[in-house]
Amino acid sequence: MEISYLCAARQADVLELRWMQISDKGIFIQQGKTGKKQIKVWTPRLREALETAQAACPKLSPDALVLYNSDRGQFIRKTFNNRWLKAVRAAQSELNRQLDYTFHDIKAKAISDFEGSSRDKQIFSGHKTESQVLIYDRKVQISPTLDRPVIGKK
């Protein structure tokens, strides 16, 4: 989840991530949907997320998956989504409120939280067009208001 958020990566791109995609520069991700190739540059938080993943799923070989199931194979979507729902329920219990989020919402949250122009967000997210980014960017825009004196009021 953390890797997906920090890299604005889709679920499938994270579940298919292999150790040979990890380099000194960052994490190489070729998005399955758009084919966009990016190296997601290291930040301390991204390194920590990868270390957490490695603690749960030790590196088996360069071509091994970064995240794997109990059989050391790739998670199937249904199993992963069940784990996601379990995590959401735990968060609901801890926060004492309903949470209606899907894993796909993580990418939208990442794009919304990323500081910069819609063009910057396009580069970050790997979308082919700015209009695609605008669909994901859910950040409420701050806009100016009209500040004129009332007519006839002194």
PLM region descriptions:
Residues 31-35, 125-150:
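Catalytic-site neighborhood detector that most strongly recognizes the C-terminal catalytic loop/helix
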Residues 16-22, 114, 122-130, 136-139:
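A short, basic/aromatic helix-end/turn motif that makes direct DNA contacts
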Residues 43-97, 110:
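Active-site/catalytic core of tyrosine-dependent DNA strand-transfer enzymes
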Residues 2, 6, 12-13, 106-128:
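C-terminal catalytic core of tyrosine-transesterase DNA break-rejoin enzymes
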Residues 153-154:
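Intrinsically disordered, low-complexity basic tails/linkers immediately adjacent to helix-turn-helix/homeobox/MYB/SANT
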Residues 7-55:
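Conserved tyrosine-mediated DNA breakage-rejoining catalytic core shared by Y-recombinases
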Residues 55-58, 89-93, 115-116, 126, ...:
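Hydrophobic alpha-helix feature that most strongly marks membrane-spanning transmembrane helices
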